[in-house]
Amino acid sequence: MLFWLTENVLALYSSRFNIVCHLTFRAIISFLSALFISLGIGHCVITWFHNLCFFQIVRCDGPKSHTQKQSTPTMGGIVLILSIVISVMVCADLSNIYVWYVFFILITYGILGLTDDILKIKKKSSKGLSVLHKYFWQSLIALTLVIIIFMSDRSLTSTQLIVPFFKNFMPQLGIWYIFLAYFVVVGTSNAVNLSDGLDGLAIMPIMFVAAGLAVVAWISNDIHFASHLNIPYICFSGELIIICSAIIGAGLGFLWFNTYPAQIFMGDVGSLSLGGTLGIIAVLLHQECLLLIMGGMFVIETLSVILQVIYFRLFGQRIFKMAPIHHHFELKGCPEPRIIVRFWIISLMLVFVGLITLKIRQ
């Protein structure tokens, strides 16, 4: 909206307004607007959800310390989605198809997560949608979008797999790229969902990964930098910086209320939608493998669950006291704030490692 207004109206009166069209300026405005919207509506949503008794449902087999969280409102992801959508609508070039691809995942996965949260509240149970139903809708949404993206760009570079540390090894996946992209979107969505188990644990790594993807989008949008690092030049990728900036701003505002002890939780409406959003951004940038590194904290959490289930079914014993792994550390007596901050540090380090791989390639 701001981009269109400047290009078509304000620039006619003075060339000074052209600064508004600059990507860096719009990214800053996107960040600030999402931050202040999140801060502005956060307290209102907390009060409203308190009055409606939209409280977090705590697992009966979880750590005993979590019983005090039962009076904490959930579904705070609505704040995140609203903040991101409004700021992106204001700051982004809405003629860019990538913006609408991301919106599609953000909103549809948000609706899916909202449905799951509402069912949990109605049932007064930690189980909302069945795993089968949730996975079906996640898959249908992701496959629909991925096929549209695949059909709209049939160039050779569109199905290349960029492998970290290897400069000239870019295998062509062809139609198999659809399944890779699908796996990245659905997998990231579920991985973030699994990681959202402690106050502020998931939102900070989400911001870190969004910042890393913003750097990659900036490089991909510059033909000289992209050529220098031997990664695809993607002319539409600039607007993804606006979206990533909005995610960071909205996340920072949400963290104001979500930090320990949390006043509100993001719920599935937040974790599923933001996880899927990070996944689709990585797909649009052709950096699926890089996301595995930068989002390594989410990968670790997911692997801990997979290993726990497989090992228990094979041997009848558990590797961890409880999965995901952050609960294991809780049950071992580690204070919740310490676990959270240490996971943040690990996540930040992995984002830096991911960005370094863009340069260290043979």
From Swiss-Prot:
Q: Does the keyword Transit peptide apply?
A: no
Q: Name one GO biological process term.
A: regulation of cell shape
Q: Identify the InterPro entries for this entry.
A: Glycosyl_transferase_4 (IPR000715), PNAcMuramoyl-5peptid_Trfase (IPR003524), PNAcMuramoyl-5peptid_Trfase_CS (IPR018480)
Q: Which coarse location class describes where this protein primarily resides?
A: membrane
Q: How does it sit in the membrane?
A: Multi-pass membrane protein
Please provide, in alphabetical order, the Gene Ontology terms of the cellular component aspect for this entry.
Answer: plasma membrane
- Domain of life of the native organism: Bacteria
Q: Which cofactor does it need?
A: Mg(2+)
Short name of one Pfam family: Glycos_transf_4
Which pathway features in its UniProt record?
A: Cell wall biogenesis; peptidoglycan biosynthesis
Q: Where in the cell is it found?
A: Cell inner membrane
Q: Where are the transmembrane segments?
A: 28-48, 72-92, 94-114, 131-151, 169-189, 200-220, 236-256, 264-284, 290-310, 339-359
Does the record bear Cell cycle in its keywords?
yes
Catalytic reactions on record: UDP-N-acetyl-alpha-D-muramoyl-L-alanyl-gamma-D-glutamyl-meso-2,6-diaminopimeloyl-D-alanyl-D-alanine + di-trans,octa-cis-undecaprenyl phosphate = di-trans,octa-cis-undecaprenyl diphospho-N-acetyl-alpha-D-muramoyl-L-alanyl-D-glutamyl-meso-2,6-diaminopimeloyl-D-alanyl-D-alanine + UMP
Q: Which UniProt keywords apply?
A: Cell cycle, Cell division, Cell inner membrane, Cell membrane, Cell shape, Cell wall biogenesis/degradation, Magnesium, Membrane, Metal-binding, Peptidoglycan synthesis, Transferase, Transmembrane, Transmembrane helix
**Family under the similarity heading:** Belongs to the glycosyltransferase 4 family. MraY subfamily.
UniProt cross-references to HAMAP family, sorted A to Z: MraY
Protein name, as recorded = Phospho-N-acetylmuramoyl-pentapeptide-transferase
What organism is the protein native to?
Blochmanniella pennsylvanica (strain BPEN)
Q: Gene name, please?
A: mraY
